[in-house]
């Protein structure tokens, strides 16, 4: 992978954060900290894109009917009751 030297301007807050990460030994250089942050941003953007696609798919799937929780429970109870069982 080819590298490109890019210059960025950071505020005091982010510069101090980068410096502390390097000083603590978590990263070997400011570039490593920036790359780690960019990887997280890239992962987050991919997750957001997948979520947006799922939302659109759900919206386009159409509206079936309102969900009736009580009817759902009743149906599940009937389905799980032993066959031939009749309450008297």
From Swiss-Prot:
Which GO biological-process labels does this protein carry?
protein heterotetramerization; regulation of DNA-templated transcription
Its keywords, alphabetically, are: Toxin-antitoxin system
Summary of the knockout phenotype: Cannot be disrupted, suggesting it is a functional antitoxin. No visible phenotype when the parDE1 operon is deleted.
Gene3D superfamilies, A to Z: Antitoxin ParD1-like
Query: Which InterPro entries does this UniProt record tie to the protein?
Result: ParD (IPR022789), ParD_sf (IPR038296), Ribbon_hlx_hlx (IPR010985)
Provide any one GO MF term from the record: protein homodimerization activity
What this chain does, per the entry, is described as: Antitoxin component of a type II toxin-antitoxin (TA) system. Neutralizes the effect of cognate toxin ParE1, but no other RelE or ParE toxin. May act as a DNA gyrase inhibitor.
Tell me its family.
Answer: Belongs to the ParD antitoxin family.
Assembly and partners?
A: Homodimer in solution, forms a ParD1(2)-ParE1(2) heterotetramer.
Protein name stated in the entry: Antitoxin ParD1
Which gene codes for it? parD1
